[in-house]
Amino acid sequence: MLYIYIKTQNALVQRINFNLDSQELPQNILWIDLLHPSAAEIAFISSEFNLEFPTKEEREEIELSAKYWEDNATITINAHFLVRDLKNDEEDRNLIKLRTEIVTFATAKNILFTIRYNEFSTFEEIQARILASPKNFEDGFDIIDKMFEVRVEKDADLLEWIDKEARRLRTSVLEKKDEYSYDEMLKDISSLQELNMRVRDSLFDKRRAMTSLLKSDKIDKDIKQNLTIVLKDLNSLVEFSVSQLNILDNIQTILASQINIEQNKIIKIFTVATVAMMPPTLIGTVYGMNFKFMPELELHYAYPIVLGVMVISIILPLVVFKKKGWL
């Protein structure tokens, strides 16, 4: 699908659902958004505007040169967008699952071109802003500027959610030890660490693109000034994500210590039980020997006496352990 945003004579912005077969390209184009484009649509736009869009393989390359490149007429950016899926599991705990989608931005003749294969809330928000406040969007670079600003805000929201969950986990570990399982807690910590690293990678990707845009002579002074402000916010978020990783590592350390304490308690119980059972075991072993000459076996009260000695030999170590504070 091709969505074309054009500037009208009364300084408003109009959105057109463009059809290749029945329409001609309008004048005063601000933005061409290619959503789930067909090969014919990409070929048409490439031919009309003398553009060369990256292939799927080029979009997925990790080299810096594949993320941003610029020539005399165009700028092309392959940016990573995080898509957030919120769903509840069987225990009604909110879990966030992220996936990474690549969006291609290209500029030519002050027109913005975007290629994407999924719906994004960022695009919906930008589209609403353009239609509501068209005077703030004079060309495609204004849209890119606001696009990065909104994306950084979205990443900030994700980091705030991660921070909230990390604090909840810390409270659970310290104050509600009996209300969770260690396996569940470790899984939650691991999930938050993975989310944090994904958001941080997304921030790094935006920082590289914004830094390159600031070096471009195609960007005017006002946009560069706003990008600089957004870049400062982004750097603060990177530092915040690092502090969150440290918090999660701290929670994991506390949890590991608690697991060790629980294991030590179990080992202590088995150790005490083993030591307490050694004397009666020894007594039983002695009197279980098949020697012919064991005169005490002939005594009338031998059996209850031996049982009593065995019970005393169990109780005595337990009393000693209790006084020592080992129980």
From Swiss-Prot:
A Gene Ontology cellular-component term: plasma membrane
InterPro entries according to UniProt: CorA_cytoplasmic_dom, CorA_MIT, CorA_TM1_TM2, Mg/Co-transport_prot_CorA, MgTranspt_CorA/ZnTranspt_ZntB
Site residues, Essential for ion permeation: 264
One example GO MF annotation: nickel cation transmembrane transporter activity
Keywords: Cell inner membrane, Cell membrane, Ion transport, Magnesium, Membrane, Transmembrane, Transmembrane helix, Transport
Membrane topology of the entry: Multi-pass membrane protein
Chain span(s) of sequence motif Probable selectivity filter: 288-290
Reactions it catalyzes: Mg(2+)(in) = Mg(2+)(out)
Stored SUPFAM superfamilies: CorA soluble domain-like, Magnesium transport protein CorA, transmembrane region
Transmembrane feature ranges: 269-289, 301-321
Subcellular location, record wording: Cell inner membrane
Family label: Belongs to the CorA metal ion transporter (MIT) (TC 1.A.35) family.
Function of the protein: Mediates influx of magnesium ions. Alternates between open and closed states. Activated by low cytoplasmic Mg(2+) levels. Inactive when cytoplasmic Mg(2+) levels are high.
Subunit structure, as described in the record: Homopentamer. In the absence of Mg(2+), interactions between subunits are weakened, and dimers, trimers and tetramers can be observed in vitro.
Domain text: The central ion permeation pathway is formed by the first transmembrane domain from each of the five subunits. Mg(2+) binding strengthens interactions between subunits and leads to the formation of a symmetrical homopentamer surrounding a closed ion permeation pathway. Low Mg(2+) concentrations trigger both a conformation change within each subunit and a loosening of the interactions between subunits. This results in an open ion conduction pathway. In addition, this results in a less symmetrical shape of the whole complex.
Annotated protein name in UniProt: Magnesium transport protein CorA
Source lineage: Bacteria, Pseudomonadati, Campylobacterota, Epsilonproteobacteria, Campylobacterales
